[in-house]
């Protein structure tokens, strides 16, 4: 059971199924057995776009000819949100992530750090119940990794968004997670 606003780490050796479970929750892979619930909703029967989830994976796609603002606003525009709500959410997310100054710049002109923050901002402007983060999203040099993990913790604490974070680093799992789900060979072996 995952409570609203929790920060959960999925921990285990490489290849044990952590990322696969994340992808199943996000609807990127079929749920092969069992049932996955979000609150009281059975996700197995809900289309991925209707799950109120956001994902932060290494292979995020940004539209390089759009500016940062338009990339972050895209999901809201596709859902026909009013302009004032789009403005408010994009600006709030940019402020939280420290990228307000780059909103008008084209993606192709941004640093990798800022591109990653735009991708994270795009994930949170839709106000998901849960943010799914694969460890590859934060994989980079130690200083950038620390900054990205701080951003994810701040999203969890400030916005009260539940975070499911995959890692095979035991220290990171203990440091970040309020609850740790241990996995081995595709199965949950312990929850602590």
Predicted regions and their residues:
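Short coil-to-helix segment of the ABC ATPase nucleotide-binding domain corresponding to the Q-loop/switch region
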Residues: 66-75
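Conserved catalytic motifs of ABC-family nucleotide-binding domains
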Residues: 127
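Conserved ABC ATPase "signature" region
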Residues: 42, 77, 84-102, 153-154
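Helix-to-loop junction immediately C-terminal to a conserved catalytic motif
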Residues: 26
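Conserved ABC ATPase signature
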Residues: 106-110, 114
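The feature captures the beta-strand-to-loop junction immediately N-terminal to the Walker
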Residues: 11-13
